[in-house]
Amino acid sequence: MPVIYASILAKYYGRQRINSDVQTINNIISDAVSVEPKAYRDAMSHYAGAVQIVTTDGPAGRRGLTLTAACSVSDAPATVLICLQKIHEDNRLFIENGVFAINTLAGTHQQLADAFSGRIGLTQNERFELATWERLATGAPVLADALAAFDCRVVSIQDHSTHHVLFGEVIALRSNPDASALIYLNRRYHTLDL
């Protein structure tokens, strides 16, 4: 049970009762059957997500990849999170560099999204050569014509199951509100006019 939730319950019900309730909840949850990974992925394919290219650069090296697993956490301080698969060893570069940029793709960026997803089989250098990149504050590559770009320093890392979850404080940002958005839904790209 999250610590914050437990502390709220303790405030209202008292510590002793909370410990008993938490144990009861944990017993119920431990008896529950987990969903099958394929069924979960199939259901999540109906969850529309903004398409992002996340990038990093620094002493450990440069890397970029396409993902939809990014979201806002807080606006004070401005914080986002990204989820990176552990199976790809090179994703450790994001952790080792301690910085990343989230580049929200416009509707015109489908080929770039494919390139950074690895579908085309390009090297990292070849992927970066396909677009114009700039730097804001951290040194992570920022796509010049991104719909929005969030330049972040890593403030927390949580490993969970198959993924590293990186929390980043937004140090700088830029937006281009006149562009359309690229979204991913039903395992396909779609353009959303703004």
Task: Give the residues covered by each predicted segment.
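Basic, polyanion-binding surface patches
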Residues: P2-L194
